[in-house]
Amino acid sequence: MKKLSQSEQKSLVARFAIDTLIEQKKIFSGMKIGLGTGSTAMPAVQRLAERIADGTLKDIKAVVTSFQTANACEEFGIPVYSLNDKAIGGKLDLAIDGADEIAPDKSVIKGGGAALLREKIVEYNAKTFVVIGDSSKAVQSLGTKFPLPVEIIADARVPVQKAIEKLGGKCVLREGVKKAGPVITDNGNQILDVLWEKPVDPKAMEKKLNEIVGVVENGFFTKNRPIVFVATQDGRVRSL
């Protein structure tokens, strides 16, 4: 049997998740849905648009986490709102997004696409959080192989880096691709990518990092235990 590529797994899990959540009546007409960012979230946005187009879903209100997702929603005809809009009222019924790493306890790392702040705002204000990923995303411990993104104020980079190093992290300023200089987030900030020499407690470290002056947000997501769907190379989708 041919093994699915990473891209094929992402498409599979995105479509499976949307269709399964509709069947389970966890996604239905009239919902306020947060939509994530990145190569796994985009197929989910597309599948949601297809289920709107075929009449399965109506009156879906989307809140997005990046310019990328806003552009996709515009292309697919999904109305986009802000959490501040009266129609949304600061709370979402459900949010769906990919992840960079998923631990057995369902804590995750997000922010590989530099949208972690907006992703956390949206997903921490959703009643239900859904995470989708390919087989490479399931790991035993977070942040020892894939770096943890930490969004920082540019003028605080050196003191923030020193503070994180005292906690056991090794920091690298994320550089732009096809752009000279560092990555600039949609919020005008910079990203430190942090690798941990030893496994850390994500919940405790999420709090510690955000206590450092100059840190805007970090990519540990531990507040909600999400519904998790992970695709496998042999074409199955499993729930964690």
Question: What name fits each language-model region?
Answer:
Residues 40-50:
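N-terminal active-site wall of soluble small-molecule enzyme domains
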Residues 30-33, 55-62, 107:
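Short active-site oxyanion
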Residues 2-12, 23, 68-240:
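Conserved phosphate- and dinucleotide-binding cores of soluble alpha/beta proteins
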Residues 32-40:
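Glycine-rich beta-strand-to-loop/alpha-helix junction loops that act as flexible
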Residues 21-31:
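Short helix-loop-beta connector
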Residues 50-53, 57-60, 66-77:
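Active-site histidine-anchored catalytic micro-motif
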Residues 18, 22, 52:
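Metal-centered catalytic cores of metalloenzymes
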Residues 18, 36, 61-64:
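N-terminal, positively charged regions that mediate nucleic acid binding
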